[in-house]
Amino acid sequence: MKMLVEKIEKKFDQEKVIEEFEDLTKDAGKIQEETLKKILEQNGGTEYLQLWGLNGRTDPQTFKNCVPIVTHNDLEPYIQRIADGDLSPILTGKPIETISLSSGTTQGKPKFVPFNDELMESTMQIFKTSFAFRNREFPIGNGKALQFIYSSKQFKTKGGLAAGTATTNVYRNAQFKKTMKAMCTPCCSPDEVIFGPDFHQSLYCHLLCGLIFHDEVQVVSSTFAHSIVHAFRTFEQVWEALVVDIREGVLSSRVTVPSIRLAMSKLLKPDPELADTIYNKCSRLSNWYGLIPDLFPNTRYIYGIMTGSMEPYLKKLRHYAGELPLLSADYGSSEGWVGVNVNPKLPPELVTYAVLPNIGYFEFIPLGGNLNGIEQANSPVGLTEVKLGEEYEVVFTNFAGLYRYRLGDVVKVKGFHNGTPELQFVCRSNLLLSINIDKNTEKDLQLAVEAAAKRLVDEKLEVVDFTSHVNVSADPGHYVIFWELSGEATDEMLQDCCNCLDRSFIDAGYVSSRKVNAIGALELRIVKRGTFHKILDHFVGLGGAVSQFKTPRCVGPKNSSLLQILSSNVVETYVSTAFC
């Protein structure tokens, strides 16, 4: 581990990193076998693997014959014992010392996931590989990154293990900062801002640091596109206060955390000239179009995860970015990494991820038309056996104690990089709007919202954010869509949007069910401005990190606190007449 850090710190050799990646992917099948063997040799003596009778064998066939495919629920009791302080080799040979929390935005509560040195090492490998391909197409010099990153506090589990979100565990690791420095993208903001206890204050200071180092900013990034859009929506509200801070060299009283105030006082000096420049730029912008390149003229690109539930934010992000390219970050989850973006010139909507064959052992459940993948759960195919154009659910085995673990993601094979597949993220397999025979995915919801939102364009209105819910307490059950708008719209327009939403779900099961009233009329509920910000605040209040926040696109019945926030902020309700 120490050697890895020293190697990164010494010099970042872009061509060598690319060469190593090419070698790994040329013989992906062999690398996969070696990776599985390594995982099983390290962990073969664990309670979990002993249970399935591997008896020291490390070949893929025996592994697949003996060890079952599982979901998080199956492993949860084992992980809980680790978190509670059981030091016996339960899932891994070496004790787990850190626990990651999943975002919790999908299911309503965070999951515990083991985190160890090997996962950190694969994170750095992903970062380095991605940067090498990115830097080849969009080279940057010595500068800084305006990174809207926020680290929630780590806490101790009942058994004394450090626990925090996956992003927190990465940001707090010494390797992270060294790697960023080696890749010429150190963060503009001091640690006190990144690790601040109040994300509103941290965000304000991230923006201020970006302005202080405006000429040095080469990359604007965050874990997710949502955080970048949220940051610049906030900038629209606070820019004049930021200008005053820069003009006077004194930090606004809105920042109250002593450690942040002290750190910022070392950076902030009176600069009337810069204050005038920023004021003039902001005053002449048309509806904030091209805000990012105007404020940070040496920025090469915007970087963050932009697929899946982040796609709805791309329109606003492009508005802020002007002509700057949007580069989608890599494919992973709290449980571990899957693939790296080696084609950074592709727009986010078309981005693919080449699977790294040495960071885990990968299997793929063929889906056909069955999004739940249950029927095929016993017949997954290997990394090199996937077929072009087919959709699969990802199953992986990693170095941190997850064995044949269903990630819950649906991917499509779009091509191959040497011997490894290039995957396109399709949707979360469990994010379905479904009442009976209808099946609508997150992508279907997104397309329906996009179609309906076009009716708002002429009025210069936009959908700020959205989510959905299946109301089965009514008979017949029906879909409920929640919208937050940027301004006021007429009843006539919103009724039209509601009907358009209903018609835009083109799944055959939905349409046929609507026609015979087996599914009731869709409801569009408009919520107050700031409602989705309240959802973000609620998530952070539960210990989540802003960097990991994803607006849940479907709120299930168990997520009662989110439903309560949404329901208590509804200002108008419209019922579809599309199938009357």
Curated annotation (Swiss-Prot):
- Domain of life (superkingdom): Eukaryota
Listed binding positions for jasmonate are: 103, 329-332
> What's an example GO cellular component term for this entry?
cytoplasm
- The catalytic activity of this protein is classed by the Enzyme Commission as 6.3.2.52
Keywords, A to Z? Answer: ATP-binding, Jasmonic acid signaling pathway, Ligase, Nucleotide-binding, Plant defense
**Induction of synthesis:** Induced by wounding and oral secretion of the herbivore Manduca sexta caterpillars.
Q: What class of enzyme is it?
A: ligase
At which positions is an L-alpha-amino acid bound?
Answer: 167-171, 534-538
- Any one GO molecular-function label of the UniProt entry: jasmonoyl-L-amino acid ligase activity
One GO term of the biological process aspect: defense response
The record lists ATP as bound by 100, 120, 123, 164, 169, 332-337
- Function per UniProt: Catalyzes the synthesis of jasmonate-amino acid conjugates by adenylation. Catalyzes the conjugation of jasmonate (JA) to Ile, Leu and Val. Catalyzes the conjugation of JA to Ile that may mediate defense signaling and resistance to the herbivore Manduca sexta caterpillars.
* Family, per entry: Belongs to the IAA-amido conjugating enzyme family.
**Name the UniProt record assigns to this protein:** Jasmonoyl--L-amino acid synthetase JAR6
The taxonomy runs: Eukaryota, Viridiplantae, Streptophyta, Embryophyta, Tracheophyta
Q: Which gene encodes it?
A: JAR6
